[in-house]
UniProtKB/Swiss-Prot annotation:
Listed result of changing H136R: Lack of protease activity. Increases sensitivity to erythromycin
Active site: E137, D205 (proton donor)
PANTHER family attached to this UniProt entry: METALLOENDOPEPTIDASE OMA1, METALLOENDOPEPTIDASE OMA1, MITOCHONDRIAL
Note on how the cofactor is bound: Binds 1 zinc ion per subunit.
Protein's job: Functions both as a chaperone and a metalloprotease. Maintains the integrity of the outer membrane by promoting either the assembly or the elimination of outer membrane proteins, depending on their folding state. Promotes disulfide rearrangement of LptD during its biogenesis, and proteolytic degradation of LptD and BamA when their proper assembly is compromised. May facilitate membrane attachment of LoiP under unfavorable conditions.
GO molecular function annotation: metal ion binding; metalloendopeptidase activity; protein disulfide isomerase activity; zinc ion binding
Family under the similarity heading: Belongs to the peptidase M48 family. BepA subfamily.
Compartments reported by the entry: Periplasm
Protein name: Beta-barrel assembly-enhancing protease
Annotated Zn(2+) binding sites: H136, H140, E201
Record InterPro entries: Mito/Outer_Membr_Metalloprot, Peptidase_M48, Protease_BepA, TPR-like_helical_dom_sf
A single BP term in Gene Ontology: chaperone-mediated protein folding
Gene name, Swiss-Prot/TrEMBL: bepA
Keywords: Hydrolase, Metal-binding, Metalloprotease, Periplasm, Protease, Repeat, Signal, TPR repeat, Zinc
Amino acid sequence: MFRQLKKNLVATLIAAMTIGQVAPAFADSADTLPDMGTSAGSTLSIGQEMQMGDYYVRQLRGSAPLINDPLLTQYINSLGMRLVSHANSVKTPFHFFLINNDEINAFAFFGGNVVLHSALFRYSDNESQLASVMAHEISHVTQRHLARAMEDQQRSAPLTWVGALGSILLAMASPQAGMAALTGTLAGTRQGMISFTQQNEQEADRIGIQVLQRSGFDPQAMPTFLEKLLDQARYSSRPPEILLTHPLPESRLADARNRANQMRPMVVQSSEDFYLAKARTLGMYNSGRNQLTSDLLDEWAKGNVRQQRAAQYGRALQAMEANKYDEARKTLQPLLAAEPGNAWYLDLATDIDLGQNKANEAINRLKNARDLRTNPVLQLNLANAYLQGGQPQEAANILNRYTFNNKDDSNGWDLLAQAEAALNNRDQELAARAEGYALAGRLDQAISLLSSASSQVKLGSLQQARYDARIDQLRQLQERFKPYTKM
């Protein structure tokens, strides 16, 4: 269903905490490493961190090339929350995002927000390797590294982090300008910041590998993935960009391997969802270049049952992307017959149906899906099928419930706006579009749309009161965000 909702936005958010920062030689034993703790209270409270996180997430949605794919969003959040459930010192909710970027990277910022680059799927051979990157970033959050870095910098140069945060925002709109501003801001205190981030990386590695192991993943995946990064730097004509600016020393790899070797060996099979997510990411994203190669699909076809299914799904996906709908349907059919409730297969079947103007077939299949009431992906698929099939009222009925339960999902608001427009409900269309603008940090535009919606309904009506109350909420949000807009 997501084929109709793809967005190709511009700019990239600078990594506040990256997986490839410089790290010093580590001690031989985990027991000798100091625990730096999680205190950062004198600079930022948890509430302030969450507020800043809310602000930056909205900027991210509005300017970065987010992959707003319901299936992939569901997968990385499910995987991320599995890891979070085995982490200590969790003080904020966690949210995981995927950016369409061919460079290997991941970063964490205020309020439990973790961003992954799509290239991680290309370079992760198995789910444990992907999870190792996420566990590392989760540890940056639980240890409050960014807040503690701000606190440390406030002691030596109080204005430095104000400029740095402003530069991060500039980078969202203009990466080169943002990086230049950030470099200039930190020039006078670079050595102190490097030392601090070295400690952060050391702690995130140590805690991350523990989270990885407790979550049931292979702890050897962390040193294995780090070794892949080093191999690229050694042998590739174009090593990962992250290693050009943040070299990864042998000592970090040696320490990660030493820690993994101290843990109980584990044989961990990647989930089927991992292979399906990898096929989908490589086949539909990565800056428009299809990286779902025949070699990879042939390799999977010779692998275990999960890989074989992913290979067949990948071939169906390739055919659908090439508008070869009959071939896609024929390839997908055995998978769907074996697992009629599988959301990955149902989503692709819906795209095939809609591509052939067979919305009614998609509707009938989705209405009978076992997990329809509990799976947001299937709900969005059905709403979209109703919309494409000329039944906007049915779509609106689903989407009003969906947006009530999933207020931060712009897909729901976008589809609801389309449904209300088709029903000629102008005020409700404007209100839905306003929510999409608000999620993207465009609060002025959101307020303007809600004001227009309010003017179109009966004076003094309950609906007008609702619109006006929402306007007041957004104005209060603007006031809370003012300190960050002035950076």
